[in-house]
Amino acid sequence: PFCDNTTEADLQTQNFNNQTTPLLISNKGRYIWCDGPFRFQLRDGKIRIESARGTIEHATAGNTLKEAYLAASGKYLPPTGILPPELFFSKPQYNTWIELIYNQNQEDILKYARSIIDNGFPTGILMIDDNWQKDYGNLNFRPDKFPNPKAMVDELHAMGFKVMLWVSPFVSPDSEEFRYLKTKGYLVKRKGSDQPAILDWWNGSSACYDLSNPDAYNHLRSTLKKMQQDYHIDGFKFDAGDPERYPEKEVDVFDRQSYDTEQTYLWAKLGLEFPYNEFRACWKLGGQPLVQRLGDKKYSWDGVASLVPSMIAAGLLGYSYACPDMIGGGEYSSFQGIDASGFDQTLIVRSCQIHSMMPMMQFSVAPWRILNKENLETCIKYAKWHEQLGDYILSQAKNASITGEPIVRHMDYAFPNQGFEECRDQYMLGDKYLVAPIMSSGNTRTVKLPKGKWKDDLGKVYKGGKTYTLDVPLSRLPWFVEVK
């Protein structure tokens, strides 16, 4: 969950825009766990760790990364036997964010959905992103942008899409909802005051639900359920909930034990009430049927290069049902000012290829708007390849729901003691596919194969235990299966 070369972190206030779990694991079979957030530091080959909120536990479960992970996840993050709806895994997902940003509106959302079908992409889940609502905390569509939202959702359903809506725990401070929630005591308060705290976040300054108050929690849940009934919405993209928004030094909450990470936990726990869910911030809920999206990646090669190591980390924290952000990136400011003809088409295609052999893939920037015919056909090919892999990916998701095993696996997890400890650019998709994507602008890459005999995507057989350099034209995603 940490940035490259992280030497220290405080999980009470830092989540690096991603999911976190109070767990450190070693490929030597050891792990460290704490029920509460901890601060740790790596220096001179030693780990210094401290926590004010829990007992720090450490154990040796064996001699490998797999043994350490399975022991820790089985004890602290046990799988439930339940997984998110199959559609998350079997079809591509689509999100209106990069195309519309804050101009979410009925006409353009329907146009985006029709373009998905017209360009030959499979239908799946469609997420309507931020600024569809009248105010934060108000779950009514803006009438100036959505003249008939129920009809829009029904039309999207008729096209073959499931529909999810962006929501957050924030409440606009000059809204009718704010006044009501303030009266009821449902909002996080300023430290030492009975007045709601106004918290800074990426869209401004807002009040925020205090989900440690059971009545506030139930009110928000009921409001979301009612919206589902009124507009036929299938589920929600639960954004925000980051622990740094609830600092103990600055706010008061209903349950005085529920600051920072506990509010993150309660926000994510709310998602268990809605099978169609997606989270970016999450705390200590590995093994649960919650869909996790990696934090927003920039439209850049650095963003592409971060996908594999970040997905591996998510799996090792118990978050198997994960999506590697949006194809090409989800950090909208990195897309601004770029003409449709000015995009790095190679970057988009390589990002799409990586997504295609992940548990989930999600489009946002419209490939048909920014790619030439040949590269568009390549993206369609890999969207359909993900669809073809659907049954296999779903089988691995079902396995994760029973055993807790990651779907995206570190090479050292699958092949211990073969020199893969530092490998961050290839991975196993379940127990079958070794995936070695291109994550830079070049057309060659080096692949290290485990012992045994391996066959690649072109049918060529290789002797394992060796390193190979492959030619990888833009139309190709290298993957291997072991020949028994």
Where are the model-predicted features located?
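Carbohydrate-binding surfaces of carbohydrate-active enzymes
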Residues: 115, 120, 142, 155-162, ...
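Generic recognition of flexible, low-complexity loop/linker segments
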Residues: 9-12, 19-21, 81-83, 114-116, ...
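Active-site pocket-lining segments that scaffold enzyme catalytic pockets across diverse folds
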Residues: 104-107, 111, 126-131
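Short, glycine-/Ser/Thr-/acidic-enriched flexible segments
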Residues: 30, 37-39, 99-100, 133, ...
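N-terminal small/glycine-rich loop or linker at the start of catalytic domains
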Residues: 84-99, 195-208
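Residue-level detector of short, conserved catalytic/binding motifs and their immediate flanks
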Residues: 19-23, 28-30, 92, 275, ...
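Catalytic and substrate-binding clefts that recognize carbohydrates or anionic sugar/phosphate headgroups
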Residues: 1-88, 106-118, 413-415, 469-483
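Aromatic- and carboxylate-enriched substrate-binding clefts and catalytic-loop regions
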Residues: 1, 122-379, 383, 412-415, ...
